[in-house]
């Protein structure tokens, strides 16, 4: 998915959903129920990528 094609509001909505997913994944990790531990890394990196796009827009960097 190319995050730069989304609007800032859509990105913020997706970041919120991914943060909730990350919370649930960490909860599963703590209780020993997590089946795919690499998903935590994927979600964290997706959040970072989206926040980077939002920040680039704020300071006027175009990619």
From Swiss-Prot:
Matching InterPro entries: Ribosomal_protein_uL29 (IPR050063), Ribosomal_uL29 (IPR001854), Ribosomal_uL29_CS (IPR018254), Ribosomal_uL29_sf (IPR036049)
GO MF annotations in UniProt: structural constituent of ribosome
Record has Ribonucleoprotein as a keyword: yes
Family annotation (PROSITE patterns): RIBOSOMAL_L29 (PS00579)
SUPFAM superfamilies, per database record: Ribosomal protein L29 (L29p) (SSF46561)
Keywords: Ribonucleoprotein, Ribosomal protein
Gene3D superfamilies given in the database record: 1.10.287.310
PANTHER family: 60S RIBOSOMAL PROTEIN L35/50S RIBOSOMAL PROTEIN L29, LARGE RIBOSOMAL SUBUNIT PROTEIN UL29C
Sequence similarity: Belongs to the universal ribosomal protein uL29 family.
Name of this protein: Large ribosomal subunit protein uL29
Species per Swiss-Prot/TrEMBL record: Bacillus cereus (strain ATCC 14579 / DSM 31 / CCUG 7414 / JCM 2152 / NBRC 15305 / NCIMB 9373 / NCTC 2599 / NRRL B-3711)
């Amino acid at each position: 998915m190319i995050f730069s094609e989304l609007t800032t509001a859509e990105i913020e909505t997706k970041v919120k959903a991914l943060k909730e997913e990350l919370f649930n994944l960490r909860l599963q990790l703590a209780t020993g129920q997590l089946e795919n531990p690499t998903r935590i890394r994927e979600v964290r990196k997706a959040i970072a990528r989206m926040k980077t796009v939002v920040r680039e827009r704020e300071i006027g960097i175009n990619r």
